Structures are given as C-alpha cells and as structure tokens.
C-alpha cells in the first residue's frame, strides 16, 4: 500500500507542469487498469486519484507561496499544470478557504525577505 502511494505521488509530482496529465496516464505508470487504480487508491487513501492529485498540487502551491516569492500566482498555476490562474485560485480557495494572494500576504515570511523589505 505504501509503495502504491509513493509511486503514485512520485508520478503525479513529476507531471505537475503537464496540463495534459490525466488518470489514464497515471494508471499506465502504475501498471494498472484505470478502474482498478481508482478502486485501489480510494481504498488506500480515502481519496479518488483526482482528489489526491489536486491535494498534492495544492500542497505544492502552498509551499511555493510561502517559500518562493519570486513566482507570481500565474506562474505557480502554470507550474502546477492548471489551465488558468483563475481556475487555480478557485481550487486553492475551495481547499484552503482563502485566495492564494491573500494567503501569501498573510503567511509568515522568511527573515531574509522581511529584512529586504525593511531596507527598501
């Protein structure tokens, strides 16, 4: 079960920036039929493969918003394979309850970035 999760996570993360990545590709990478993959992942994780993919993308978005201030919302959305920044923002807000830009403004920033802001 852990090997399945690890492999699925690795495949999904490797394809973050691929807007054409879909569940058929994931099933192929996992050497499973699509139906079996859906059943196994739902059984192991309690999430559908689509939900798991979205969860991983949004967790990475959270990290990028916190740790990579050089990327704007559009860049983050495209890096993670979203078809538009608007769709990314809607998904992020639905998952975390706050828009990505608001999250970035309200999240604690690293000391070095805060010091740079003070010096400007």
Pin down the residues of each PLM region.
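A sequence-composition feature that detects small, non-aromatic residues
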Residues: 8-9, 27, 61, 99, ...
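Membrane-proximal linker segments that couple transmembrane helices to downstream signaling/catalytic modules
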Residues: 1-31, 36, 40-43, 118-119
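Terminal helix-turn-helix DNA-binding modules in bacterial transcription factors
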Residues: 43-83, 105-120
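Basic, amphipathic alpha-helical hairpins
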Residues: 9-21, 41, 45, 62-72, ...
